[in-house]
Swiss-Prot record:
It comes from the Archaea. One of its GO terms (cellular component) is plasma membrane. This is S-layer protein B. Residues 1-20 form the signal peptide. Residues 310-330 form a coiled coil. The chain crosses the membrane at residues 392-412. It comes from Metallosphaera sedula (strain ATCC 51363 / DSM 5348 / JCM 9185 / NBRC 15509 / TH2). Keywords: Cell membrane, Cell wall, Coiled coil, Membrane, S-layer, Secreted, Signal, Transmembrane, Transmembrane helix.
Amino acid sequence: MKYNLLPLILLSLLVAPLLAMGSAPAITVTTQPVYHPGQTVFISGVTSPNTLVGITIYNPQGKAVYSNTTTSGPNGDYSLKAFTFPLQESTTFPFGTYTVQVGTQTGFTNSTTFQFLPLTATVNVLVVNPQGVPIQGATVTADSVTATTNASGQAVLNLPTGTYTLKVVPPSPYSPASENITVTAPNTYSFKITVQIQELALQVVSATSPNVNLKDLTSGTSITMIGGTTLTLMSMVTFAGQPISTATVTAMYNGTMYNATYMNGYYVITISVPNTQYETDLVIQATYSGMQSNTVTLPLTVNVNEQAIIASLNSTIQSLESQISSLSSTVSTLSSSVTSLSNTVSSLSSTVSKLNGTVASLQSSVSTLSSEYSTLNSRVNALSGLSGTVDIALAVSIIAIIISIVVLILVFRKIS
């Protein structure tokens, strides 16, 4: 019988370091939590006395940027001056989190991390109203660094050396304010910004559509809706903190100006958006007695409503089918009318043919009567030559009248 000794060999190799570690002391590693450009990194810790310690430092991308060894002292302490960060971040030394890994020849390891960040100045900002009362909830921004004031009206920004525009956007009814500042790291600065009451203030209370239901919108709030639907905006306008009902509220959308209607305490704007894919800004503003309110800009994204397109196409198809059915019925009716007219024409042709035969017969009868009349007339003339009496003439006249009556009767009978 053959035995596979490989698992036993691997097990012995794994157990041996563990047995050694059971009697060996651990190793610690420390460094300061944050470094800035131009600062030197120091690593220190404790392990067993006179022990060789390996140290490796990895940048945020996991690439080793430093590796070295040192030996602990008689009491087990070790320290190492690793490297100095450049004055600007680089590909090798980017800003971010660095990892320090240490290990001893006896098999102990440990690790820690530190941050490499720009050297910054501490900027304390105090936001107050004209009476000096702190304003809570104001957004303070310098470039991409943002903070919000607390209940004491204070916000703290950490900014690298440079010149900035400090922007303050307070809650209603206060108007935004800004101030240009210059700071040098690592100094600490304090700024006090006073915000004024917005005499004419516009607040967008809600935005609704079949798939949108947003409340208390501020400038920059994004709206995403489906095309072919209607967006309803409800706003309030206050003057010196009091609601007013006679302001003019407008919304500029896709190059078209929409005017609001005042209803039940709100200015209502209804916008029908086409069923096409596009992005635009919805800009809302109020005017009152020559004053202009704050501007609220709402980025609007419209997505295509494919179901509405399909429904419209189905409706169009049904309408066309109905029209085709109606046209088919009309064609059938016209065909029937043509057939009826054809039968009528055929009947009239037969009648005309019969009338032609009747006329020919009447013409023959008239010709016969005319011949008989000529014969009678000749006889009358002969009689007139023999006697010339009135009685004979009268008799001939009567006979002529009778013949005419007979002819007329025959003609009327033929026609009827």
